Amino acid sequence: MITEIVTFGIGNGLQRSDVVALYEKSVPAWKENRNLLHKSFLYDPEHEVGGGIYLWNSIDAAKSAHGPAFQNRIQEVFGSQPEIRYFESPVVINNHGDANVEATS
């Protein structure tokens, strides 16, 4: 499994309520992506940074979801290019289930 951390500056005069509304608007599309196991939206008002933490089945799935179209959309909406980092997640804890989930490769 792959953990992906995406961060971007929040410009364009957006307030917290604007950012949350934009996040909520994107939820249905993320729910449709069967390669996405988990997503947490991020917001840091002090540093004007937003983003997300994603858990994916594979690096290919992560890169596919956050290609040029996604990056251009972030630039247009939030006023900055996203920074994207990938991490292997060999063990994942799920406190809402009975077992830890281990990566298969």
Q: Predicted segments — roles?
A:
Residues 1-50, 59-68, 78-105:
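Short S/T/G/P-rich N-terminal loop/turn motif that feeds into the first structured element of a domain
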Residues 72-76:
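A common structural junction motif
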